[in-house]
Amino acid sequence: MSKTFEELFAELAIKSQTRPAGSGTVEELDRGVHAIGKKIVEEASEVWMAAEHEGNERLAEEICQEIYHLQVMMIKQGLSLDDVYKHL
């Protein structure tokens, strides 16, 4: 099922507040900024490799994963969507 950038952020924000058992998002938030940052860097390299070697379908998947980890970082640091939108 697809969702918008805003819907994903809302879902992740709810998970950060309700902390459902077994949630990968909660686990990532608990690991902290350093671990989240490492995931962002890892996913960025996977976006690049997908663009060069794996085609647009794989590229879209990797971009989605990058967006997920960026939003987790936003939530961890207390940034809202509006905090980011004002810089677009």
Curated annotation (Swiss-Prot):
Subcellular location: Cytoplasm
Species, as recorded: Cutibacterium acnes (strain DSM 16379 / KPA171202)
Name of the top EC class for this enzyme: hydrolase
Molecular functions (GO terms): ATP binding; phosphoribosyl-ATP diphosphatase activity
Stated family: Belongs to the PRA-PH family.
Main subcellular location of this protein, as a coarse class: cytoplasm
GO annotation, biological process: L-histidine biosynthetic process
GO cellular component, one term: cytoplasm
One Pfam family, short name: PRA-PH
HAMAP family: HisE
Keywords: Amino-acid biosynthesis, ATP-binding, Cytoplasm, Histidine biosynthesis, Hydrolase, Nucleotide-binding
Reactions accelerated catalytically: 1-(5-phospho-beta-D-ribosyl)-ATP + H2O = 1-(5-phospho-beta-D-ribosyl)-5'-AMP + diphosphate + H(+)
InterPro entries tied to this protein: HisE, PRib-ATP_PPHydrolase-like
Name of the protein: Phosphoribosyl-ATP pyrophosphatase
Record flagged with keyword Metal-binding: no
